[in-house]
Amino acid sequence: MTARILVVDDIPANVRLLEVRLLAEYFEVLTAGNGPDAIETCENGKVDVVLLDVMMPGMDGFEVCKRLKSDPATSHIPVVMITALDQVSDRVRGLEAGADDFLTKPVNDLQLMTRVKSLVRLKSLTDELRLRASTTRNIGIEELLSRNFATEDTKPKVLLVDERKSSIERIQKMLRGSADLDVATDPNAGFFQAAETAYECVLISTAFADFDALRLCSQLRSLDRTRFLPIMLLADEGEEGRIIRGLELGINDYLTRPIDQHELTARLRTQVRRKRYNDQLRASVT
């Protein structure tokens, strides 16, 4: 998978660090040292994902994001805000400005590549839907692309597979009002529940005492009915090996504990949009 990534930061060393990492994964990299240049690049070039630093002199990252998301010509480009580790307020402002995801400094390689690849896939689907909408004047596609996924009538149906009561209660609290959440405390029951219900995402905890969560991920990917169902892994710190194995098995994304509500909301929104776009594309060719 390759794509054109725009890195926006006023500190050249930060730009170079991200550029080297992305080039190593065969992405094409564009750079901008300030907000106006970033906006101009998005308007003039085929940018697939923007990595945008929050703290920049003059026009900061929030204003850049807000302008990109308010312009119909650039609103479909995914924006990842790069924030300081302890600045929860930055994530709130980023969501309000329209950011699609967050990365915290220092940026972890696994997180960087997972977020970028996830959003590149979403951008590819968005481009395909935009093309079909422009050539066929398909009203259903246009409505899907413009829909706000936080509204009551489009609230996603999500399954959480977890056995720890405290963890379940935290996720329920985080997603209250933004998702229709079901819970399965037994992974085998969760498998059948996922197969029999029209979920738009499954959250799978790695913290089972006597069950390998990756087994469930593998089973869901092997079943025709759940092959394209987005899966997010909820892992503990230090489980990078399991996360990498999960990505190899086909999970779409992951979160590490302690889970941040804003990151969970943003990642879930990305996966739900991807699922709905995929469903629309498959329906349009049948």
Question: Which residue ranges define each predicted feature?
Answer:
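CheY-like receiver
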Residues: R121-P156, L160, S166, R273-T286
